[in-house]
Amino acid sequence: MDIVVENRKVRFNYFIIQEFDAGIVLIGSEVKSLRQRKVSIAEAYVTERNMELWLCNLHISEYNQASTRNHNPTRPRKLLLRKKQIYKISGNIKNDGFTVVPLCLYFNDKGIAKVKVVIVKGKKLHDKRETIKTRDWNREKSRILRGGN
């Protein structure tokens, strides 16, 4: 599994409820830009239209060696999932407090582009502070066990 890009802010800003691996419909110049890691998923989110899931605001830069007919960098891209998974995700999109965002974009062992989407619930400010405290304590604990300062 070759991870192209990961949205690390998701783990800090949200509680992860459930993860799904989804295929993504891309054109050739988009795949080549992905292989060059010219992609940003910081502002991306998943929406539902006509019982299909779409990944919006995923920015894949234009491929320089492509012809003049290059792709639109922020166009909505269709996600490929099983019907049961689509029903589960679309039901959570309609619930208050839940959202669906991409966690990472990667190429699997066969070289196919996949996106890991997660159902998340937003954290409050005190939850974020608690996350920081536990992370710092674990770091300090490992330092003490190693015998360092």
Curated annotation (Swiss-Prot):
Biological process (GO) annotations?
Answer: trans-translation
Which compartments does it reside in? Cytoplasm
GO MF term set = RNA binding
Q: Name one GO cellular component term.
A: cytosol
Principal location listed in the UniProt entry: cytoplasm
The superkingdom of the source organism is Bacteria
Fetch the InterPro entries from UniProt: SmpB, SsrA-bd_prot, SsrA-bd_prot_CS
Assigned keywords, A-Z:
Cytoplasm, RNA-binding
* Alphabetized HAMAP family for the sequence: SmpB (MF_00023)
Q: What does this protein do?
A: Required for rescue of stalled ribosomes mediated by trans-translation. Binds to transfer-messenger RNA (tmRNA), required for stable association of tmRNA with ribosomes. tmRNA and SmpB together mimic tRNA shape, replacing the anticodon stem-loop with SmpB. tmRNA is encoded by the ssrA gene; the 2 termini fold to resemble tRNA(Ala) and it encodes a 'tag peptide', a short internal open reading frame. During trans-translation Ala-aminoacylated tmRNA acts like a tRNA, entering the A-site of stalled ribosomes, displacing the stalled mRNA.
For this chain, the family text in UniProt reads:
Belongs to the SmpB family.
Q: What is this protein called?
A: SsrA-binding protein
Organism of this sequence: Ehrlichia chaffeensis (strain ATCC CRL-10679 / Arkansas)
Lineage of the species this protein comes from: Bacteria, Pseudomonadati, Pseudomonadota, Alphaproteobacteria, Rickettsiales
